[in-house]
Amino acid sequence: VFGGNTSFIPFAAQHRGQSVRGTLETYHERARKSVIDYSFHLIVSDPTEQVLAEELPEAFEGGITSFKVFLTYDKLIVSDEALLDILVTARKHGALTMTHAENNALIKWMVSRLVAGGYTAPKFHAVSHPGAAEAEAISRATRLANFVGAPLLIVHVSTDEGANIVAD
């Protein structure tokens, strides 16, 4: 490689029913012929006991230093209890947890009302994700991270209220 990007760190997404180990093996196989340096941010959506006790520590030992969890989207969302377990595991191994913080229930509530009213054009996506959904989830996630003494990176901050919570 001459100039340009010399490294790439995409997300490797674990979905429900998949192991972290298998997810990383699949992504490493896809990157096998890479001519640049690569690593992965891991998306964790199924933090089973095995994932927390064995597979995440193995991933950290294998060079994964950060991962992302979602507080919204039905196929990716983790519960508050799972988030606490993930934060503690990450803290123990010196890894960084990132989160997409939006209140899933509020978004689903808004979507159902918009769809029922016939408001389905793409411009209503933003309406279905009100600032209150972001602010509540950022507040909740940061309080949980502070409670267990774990670092947390909030991604996609798009509101003044959310930014103010992060700044505090």
Model-derived segments and their meaning:
Residues 22, 36-37, 93-95:
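Short acidic, glycine/proline-enriched helix-loop-strand junctions
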Residues 3, 36, 62:
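Structured loop/turn residues at beta-strand edges in well-structured enzyme cores
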